[in-house]
Amino acid sequence: MKRQAFSLLSRLNPWQQLLLSAVLVTLAAPAAAQLRAPGTRTQGIFTQQGSQSASQGSTVAPSQPMMGVPQPSSQPRSQLVDEVVAVVNNSVITRRELLDRADEIESQLRAAKREVPPRPDLLGEVLERLVMERVQTQAAQEAGIKVTDQEVDRAIESVAQQNKMSATELRSRVEASGMSWTKYRDELRKQVQVIRLREREVDSKVQVYDGEIDNYLAARNGGQAAASGPTEFNVAQILVRVPEDASDAQKAQLKTKAEGLLKQVQGGADFAELAKANSEAPEASQGGSLGFREIGRLPAVFANAVVDLQPGAVVPEVLESANGFHVVKLVSKRTAAAQPAASDRIAQTQVRHILIRTGPNMPEAEAKRQMATIRDRITHGVDFADAARRYSQDGSASQGGELGWVSPGELVPEFEQAMNRLRPGEISDPVVTQFGVHLIQVENRRETEVSPEKQRDFARAEVREQKLRAAYDDWVRQLRSAAYVEYRINRQR
């Protein structure tokens, strides 16, 4: 199973997706990630299938930080008078930050020959994204999460690899864009901090049970694809947030406010406009819409209230949650496209490698230099297996570096991506992962039957990923709802 970065992207239109991802590329997986697939436990660089409890723990690689190569700014703003456009808890977002980010997104849209949205819409989306980033970064910092310089170095190396350049070339591009190298590293460090927080607060709490795997396989492998997919609900909300330390009198006052909004909706007022003007939820600028979701991906308090409603109906009473009071509407619902039956064959790669581990006594640059020398010797006649036995620091060294036949999704992304670019017999350039520096050789490729055990492994990974996406959405929403955010400009202008 490929490892997808779960996010809110599935709810956004194409230009909003580019707003969040732009020229983003995947970085090195956190050190806790395994070389092998979800649901396995490590034995050196090799792994074996673990028990259910192992697969429910922290062995699944979390979604990874994203960072792109900054583009040169056509209009430096060093002489602009800056001002605060939003306050997020105890920090601020400035107009310069907002305009710089919006310009970058607009530049990427134009470069991709994509339609550029109206400037007010773009600025509103960018500002909300900056708020969401700031809220998550603050939560990570308050949790005391630290990211080492070595982790940042590893992430930078991966960015460079993904953009087919060296770390030195990446630095030149960054500085040419007008961003200092220190700033770039700081931004990357913040992203890794957020990933660490999510590992602790979201990833580690998601479990997958055998019954869920059975249901998934029954739906996917029932002989034929289902005639139709699951029902999806497009729910919108207006949130009246209640502070954690609110008194009973304050709660009563805020509930009265929510009930007043409900009466306006029941009286024919436009729900989306009321949400834009009154909701304190992150999706307020989209009229309160959460986008289409299966019932299991909705907050439980919403799911129970809307499951039997007709499209266009409003829940007849104000709902209460830990975040406050909600006015909820079922905007529409639809039947999702059917999932195709799972293939009973997969492509596998026979691969071997040489590993030099990096650490305090082996800097990454030196490991790459040594690996380049080893590669040169192999290309001039030294046997790969002999070189692996002599130089590799992996448990596979005694077997000539053999990892055997591997399936898609079984290896960390940097390794698998480099492997997939090779033809049988070819040898990679040095490849950096969290384990160190690798030299990879593809020996052969084949298609093979998927065993029942492997199907369950894949199903477990897919079910877990679906649950992670839902849990992540809810986690981000709770962080945003609990934050103090004051807009100093109208997000709709």
From Swiss-Prot:
The keyword Mitochondrion does not apply. PROSITE patterns: PPIC_PPIASE_1, PPIC_PPIASE_2. Its EC number is 5.2.1.8. Residues 230-332, 346-444 form the PpiC domain. Residues 1-33 form the signal peptide. HAMAP family: Chaperone_SurA (MF_01183). Chaperone involved in the correct folding and assembly of outer membrane proteins. Recognizes specific patterns of aromatic residues and the orientation of their side chains, which are found more frequently in integral outer membrane proteins. May act in both early periplasmic and late outer membrane-associated steps of protein maturation. This is Chaperone SurA. The lineage of its organism: Bacteria, Pseudomonadati, Pseudomonadota, Betaproteobacteria, Burkholderiales.
